[in-house]
């Protein structure tokens, strides 16, 4: 759905059944590398240039934007407003069959789906309805993009696969979102942002737009959350009266509905959530009388029951500060200890945290606030920047966990506010 510069059919390996289909590859290449409008005044920041070295390892790439899939592309645009190539031979489904075409589409980068939608009405319907993403999910195909906000009402997105920045439309100017105290989560093809007065806005990559979303059954803030596939889970937090909650809910991004879940054993706010080994975990937080909780809770989706894990967050950070900064990669739990600037890994067998090494040097925080720590596919991502009095820079560092101490790679940098208010990773 999101356009960029020159693209090709295969962004990652395809089954051998797709290789002989040169006609489909040619047609897709013609559309994806065709004549499309791109902002000429905005460029992706090159790392060498950002470092001040005065050298470029590659020419600047145009920054993609996130148009509605009905945006036209060059001369193929119809008067109706939706681009579609004309001619009986222009629809690959007629040439190689629907099943094989869809199999190829599933493995195409989702940043190309805006162009794919211009091939035919069938393709456009698959993208606009979200069917293509449901099929990707069923086939185990996903790309993870990072969405984060360093300014009120503004969001940036970054595609680490193609090293591209993507423009996200500005949020509607609702007064409830004018302060920085918001929470967010990504689920399916949606980004949910929660603000004061229990107002929720939903950004959809299918339409590239923001809309008002239904609130939870028990609206809350300062809760723990996570998502897997088209489902999201929230637990704990506080209600509008400041009462600390033990209740939990599940959100279905396909139906846009919230369903109550059994309550946790202990009420908590300022907790964190992850999905690991097929279960929902809520870690840390604060109970009544500002008592810090070191226990975690595990929710079994099949049994619909919670289990307390004592001392699960013992040794993470101090008694004050942000909720635990945790992330799961390949069913292994990691934490950013912002008090010591350490990266830690959870030892499931012994219920303890092991220090692996340090966090990126230039990623600073205010007791954990302003720093983002997320899983992005098979890698960990730290988003933050150095504190400066003039201007600001946001940096994205990544590391793919292995058996060695972490070696962080700077994958992106751009001028921006360097305090991250919200961050979510969308995998679809």
Predicted regions and their residues:
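Conserved short beta-strand element of beta-propeller blades
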Residues: 94-95, 116, 134-150, 174-194, ...
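Short active-site-adjacent structural elements
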Residues: 364, 382-383, 389-394, 404-408
